[in-house]
């Protein structure tokens, strides 16, 4: 990525961010350029992704400045967000003043400190300069009179596509015309919804399929098709030729490719994801750029060569002078009385203290306020082991922020101990449910599955289940087939109208009852028989990954997970592994509400597999030999936390011992109250909701079943911290559902491997989730996906606004906004708090270069709490 300073004159230059571009072949060039976009997963397996994951070698500030310059995208919170947060008490003014003093101390300037501070204090109010001042003849005349001051110049380092510089006779920008064509070809090639008519030659790749059809495209003019008639057969040759004919010098080609990738980051992100899934499509990004830039050449060729194509940008001094007049209280007369050196110093200072710098200081003050509030909340004094209350059940929940309120209310209502662990429970598996031919990678998307686990049933019971499932699927298949067929699609409304009309009326007016009826009907009809898993290792050459586990692998995964949460002794009679899932209707983003650690799927499958492994005699015997002795009367069970309705659904309960049965009954007895309290807390945070809720659980079910409900739950909005430590650190704290919680006992981690594993796995997932919510909040027009009510699900891949927009990569407006003008999510970078001695943190940072880079470059924040309870910011 090419990030260059905004001006070249030394007095106005910001921190040098030049990155040299060396000669590379086209593959390397495209690979380097691809860092500016993030892979985009299909919406059916919606995985939180960090939009700047390829740019972490640069600082957050550098990337923010580059995006502002290259795409006019602001990734700092807006002034309205900052003012709102300050009004709510989320930003302490003292932290802003500390930040300003540090910034002033770091700068070299030759104006009185008092003058600089006065200017900064006024500028930090984030008021816009009045348009009347900026356009005043007096100001512009003053700017002309002192124009002899050389403010420097710059080349357009972002290398905007040439098409973006041209308008056709209709007044349409040619980049919009180009995007229209590219969206069409991407939809045709990437379509994953089983269209009746697929793109011809699709199996040969995007470029060759496009090359075969482009000369017949009626949307292009005759001259445009003529340009592409004898175009190279291979993508690399086409891309090289197009860049040459457009006159893009080799030194600027990477930046030019970046500009094109950023023009449609959603479609380009989906292309990049596909290129990473198979060897067959590994050159897909090159093919995409070859198609795009070849078409750009055809469209812009009549306008070439452009006049002033390489014109340099000048830094306008008008807003710089205006800022000193408005914020620094310097009149035009005083300006004229200054020497050129004094004027230059003032302009340089105003330039350095730009909008991004001001918002950066506000963001850091906001983050420091949150850290200080969290520091005051959490208890740093761990209870002595013998002071712990006797527990009858231990429940392990996903680290998901939605688990925190549920765990808190559960612990208050009974003798229960809860743990936090990544919801895939450390099992790198691909799951295949009963009767399915497809497997799902049920683990974080940053990992690859190593084992395939299939759900199995008795042959006779399975046949009966399969028949019922075929009846259910045949109805859906028939409807979809009729819908796609040219003739039957005209008959379908007449046939299905009355039934669908009745469904629409009942779904709209009595959603909870109808939704519950349909759900129960399908549940009874498709009731699974008793199932088991293919846990034992089977060598199958037809499978890419082995089925099941060896004995050593079973023991290893159980040991690893138990040690990770510090559960190696004092087992309760009942240990429950709790995955989590969501429940909503008519929601394209359903996968976004599922378990991120399970690749956008429910976590129950993993929970059940892990609990089953823990109950195996062979596993217990091996663990006992290693010192992890699980009592005979301790039973592992599995459940699923339904986050939309805050209920616990049992999915695996083996035969229980007497003590375990007592614990089970205890959990069942308090669960209605837990659900009531958790639902009440969660529902009152939804906008325009009545503060007095007679029956919170009933209301939660209505939200889950109502197909017109745009916000069935807040998901992971307002997430802000990831706390790694023992439960005692946070047990009595109301963390407001804003913290990822992962158990960790540094005393059982002498070499630091467990901590390193938590940071590399769950820590990375939490960071991706955090930055996706951050990006969708601060730049919803670029990194979000707009309003849910106007979205179109396209090609089985994702959503668009209308039928000719980018493939929208982020979260919808309803996931982060409370109203048109007020945000719900607080855009703060993730604060990772680790409960461990200082030497553990130092070792982690020394050994994990990637994590150290994230901390140093401002992509995450880091703090620690040592054994004496001392808090340290890193």
Swiss-Prot record:
Upper lineage: Bacteria, Bacillati, Bacillota, Bacilli, Bacillales
Top-rank taxon, per record: Bacteria
Record has Metal-binding as a keyword: yes
Gene name linked to the record: dabA
Cofactors that this protein relies on: Zn(2+)
Entry binding sites for Zn(2+): 398, 400, 580, 595
Predominant subcellular localization, coarse grouping: membrane
InterPro entries: DabA
Pfam families: DabA
Record's function text: Part of an energy-coupled inorganic carbon pump.
Intracellular or extracellular location(s): Cell membrane
Family label: Belongs to the inorganic carbon transporter (TC 9.A.2) DabA family.
Subunit-level organization: Forms a complex with DabB.
Keywords: Cell membrane, Membrane, Metal-binding, Transport, Zinc
Protein name from the UniProt record: Probable inorganic carbon transporter subunit DabA
GO CC annotations on file: plasma membrane
UniProt membrane topology term: Peripheral membrane protein
One GO MF term attached to the UniProt entry: zinc ion binding
Disulfide bonds: none
